[in-house]
Every structure is written in C-alpha cells, then in structure tokens.
C-alpha cells in the first residue's frame, strides 16, 4: 500500500549504479529501510531530499513482509544542510543521528522519540551558534524517552533531597551513578559494582536546569567548558544504557545488500 509519513533521514548508502538505500526514522512506523531507485541520478528530483539530517514527508510503497521498502516521493520540511555551513552544527547533527540509529528499531513506533529528534533538528536549523547545549538537552531527553531517566531530586541511595543537602552540607561535589541512573550524596553507602563519578555540583545544577527546560525553549546558560563536560557525562551515560539494547536486525540486512 502507498503510505505518507513524516521522517528523519538517518543514513544513506550508495547502492549499485544510481540508486541508494536510506534508513529513516518515521513517525508512524519507527525505523524503516527504503530503496530510492535512481536516487543518485542527476535527473532525480527527490534524491537530494533523502540526505542524512533532513526532515521530510516521504511517500512509500510499503509491504508488511518486506525488509526493504520502496520510496517514491518526498517533500522537504526542514534541512540543517541548507543552513550556513557550520562544522559544529554538522558535528552535533551526526552525533544525534548516530545515537538515534541505535536507540530505535525496525517497525518500532515511538512517537516521543520521533518528536524529540524532529524538534532537535528544527533547533539546529534555527540556531546560528552554541550548538553543544542543544546536544546536551537532546541526550538528557533521549535517555528519558528510553526509560532511563536519571534521578535528579533525591539521592539514589539515601533518598535525601539533593538541593537541600547541597545547601545544608555546603557541598561542591556529588556522585553521578550510571546504574541506577542519577546523583548521590558523598558518603552514601555505594553497592558493590556500581559505576560512579565525582562531579562538580555545577554539573548537577546545569543538568537539572536542562531537565526543566522545554524542548523548544532556550537552553540554560553555562560556560562552554561546563556544557562540554556535561555533554560528555550524558553521552557516557547514554552509551552505557544503549549498549544493553538488543541488536537491530535491519543493520545486518543493509550490510548484506551493500556487499551483494
């Protein structure tokens, strides 16, 4: 059947002479692998629309028993690639796309995830500088969408209020705990095998401010060094939990098609 769906292009790969295979994150169907016949031809009107990072309305010939669907048409909604070239924008964009590839699976509808990715791409399109806070916000919301929201209000071990304890004990450091995710007070009884990091209280306050900020609102202010450190922390936390997700069979399918 012919279906129309909004989609984010996660990846494109050359296929044979003039075609290409694309991995899409769609609103209605989750990840879908599609082939765009003649998509690399100079005469193709839609080939360039199926470029990584583009937000598009795609028309597909979809069959339920087929691993590779046929893309027939598309219209552009937003494209970070059409903005003024900026290496930092592209770096953030491709980190987002790479994470989403592993955070979602074929035919697994996840509207909150799609909404987050689409909103992040729109933010990248509408922002002229300071792209790292957008990445930090994306990482924090991604782990929440996937069900790994870190505890930000209370110590994950003692259940004491974190803000109150910081003020009362005049703390300048907290413990970041990867599993269970969240923050803990120094001196807490840490279970054997728990992965923890000592982090400045300023990291905690910035992450808490990010969590309270809507996806379309301006990111809280912080120094570039603070943003970079928090982004690295959240990326490590995200990778820790994504590494436990099941292997996605569509990646094998695409690899076999490329090598055919």
From Swiss-Prot:
Q: Name the chain's protein.
A: DNA repair protein RecO
Please name the GO terms of the biological process aspect recorded for this protein, alphabetically: DNA recombination; double-strand break repair
Q: Name the SUPFAM superfamilies for this protein.
A: ArfGap/RecO-like zinc finger, Nucleic acid-binding proteins
Keywords, alphabetical? DNA damage, DNA recombination, DNA repair
GO cellular component terms? Answer: bacterial nucleoid
Q: What does this protein do?
A: Involved in DNA repair and RecF pathway recombination.
Q: Does the keyword GTP-binding apply?
A: no
Does the keyword field hold Coiled coil? no
- What InterPro entries does the record point to? ARFGAP/RecO, DNA_rep/recomb_RecO_N, NA-bd_OB-fold, RecO, RecO_C
Q: Which family does it belong to?
A: Belongs to the RecO family.
């Amino acid at each position: 059947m012919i279906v129309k769906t909004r989609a984010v292009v996660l990846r494109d790969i050359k296929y044979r002479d003039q075609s290409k295979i694309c991995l899409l994150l769609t609103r209605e169907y989750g990840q879908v692998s599609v082939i765009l016949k003649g998509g690399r031809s100079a005469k193709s009107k839609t080939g360039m629309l199926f470029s990584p990072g583009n937000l598009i309305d795609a028309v597909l010939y979809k069959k339920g028993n087929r691993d590779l669907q046929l893309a027939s048409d598309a219209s552009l909604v937003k494209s970070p690639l059409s903005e003024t070239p900026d290496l930092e924008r592209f770096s953030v964009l491709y980190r987002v796309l790479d994470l989403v590839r592993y955070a979602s699976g074929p035919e697994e509808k996840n509207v909150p995830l799609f909404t987050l990715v689409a909103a992040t791409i729109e933010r990248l399109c509408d922002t002229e500088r300071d792209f790292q806070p957008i990445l930090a916000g994306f990482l924090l919301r991604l782990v929440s969408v996937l069900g790994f929201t870190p505890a930000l209000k209370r110590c994950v071990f003692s259940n004491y209020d974190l803000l109150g304890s910081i003020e009362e004990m005049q703390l300048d450091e907290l413990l970041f705990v990867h599993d269970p995710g969240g923050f803990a007070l120094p001196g807490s009884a840490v279970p054997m095998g728990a992965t923890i990091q000592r982090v400045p209280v300023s990291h905690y306050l910035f992450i808490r401010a990010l969590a309270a900020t809507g996806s379309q609102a301006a990111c809280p202010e912080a120094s570039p060094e603070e943003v970079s450190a928090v982004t690295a922390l959240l990326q490590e936390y995200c990778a820790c939990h994504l590494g436990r997700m099941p292997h996605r069979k569509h990646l094998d399918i695409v690899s076999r098609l490329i090598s055919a």
